[in-house]
Amino acid sequence: MTQTTRSVPTAFEITRRENCFQGFYKLDKLYLRHELFDGGTSKEISRELFVRHDAVCVLPYDAKRDEVVLIEQFRVGAVQKTGNPWLIELVAGLIDKDEQPEEVAHREAEEEAGLVFGALWPITKYFPSPGGSDEFVHLFMGQCDSQGAGGLHGLESEGEDIRVTVWSFDDAMQAVADGRIINAATIIALQWLALNRAEIRGLWS
């Protein structure tokens, strides 16, 4: 990578913001200018922004058995891109106002998978699609007992129909390699576990 001594741009100005749609999610149109890498300022540009709650995703891991607990559910976003919109995913949920990410992790583990976490390990935080969305993801690993995990879960009031499955670590990684797991947070979390598995097993076993 070519190194440069030029400073990174930091200045921007939002000149106008319009709401285009308001439902469970929101779509806004922003008009803005921002500093350029050459030191100048851009002309006014417009960008559509998908506004949504920040999210928490958790990989439940039983270090003693070297097993992960994953969920499957129907995802409307995958309807037109794949022949099977039932995706293999992590336990996940949206952060409500005044909630801490850790609270969401524990709540969703119980609601979506019937699990109680003994501890949480922060993996990373990231923007999944910052070119058009402000969603920010908090990614954790949760210490769990996988024995007896499984079955159908989810809140009927939210239309959730969730199947919980237990995987050996090796089988889960093979599902990533085979393209059966195509959810980004799940892939990131499993690859992180692959890099840190020995340490985690030493601490949580």
Language-model features, listed with the residues they occupy:
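Nudix hydrolase/Nudix homology domain
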Residues: T2-V8, F12, R16, E72, ...
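Acidic pyrophosphate-coordinating catalytic loop
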Residues: N19-G23, G39, V79-K81, Y126-H138
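Acidic, metal-coordinating catalytic segment for phosphate/diphosphate chemistry
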Residues: C20-R65
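Short, well-ordered beta-strand micro-motif
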Residues: K29-Y31, P60, M141-Q143, V166-S168
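Active-site-adjacent beta-strand/loop module that shapes the phosphate/pyrophosphate-binding cleft
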Residues: L32-L36, S129-G150
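Conserved Nudix-box catalytic region and its N-terminal flanking loop in Nudix hydrolases
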Residues: R47-F50, E67-R107, H153-E158, I162
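Acidic/glycine-rich phosphate/pyrophosphate-binding loops and surrounding catalytic core
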Residues: V116-W121, F127-P128
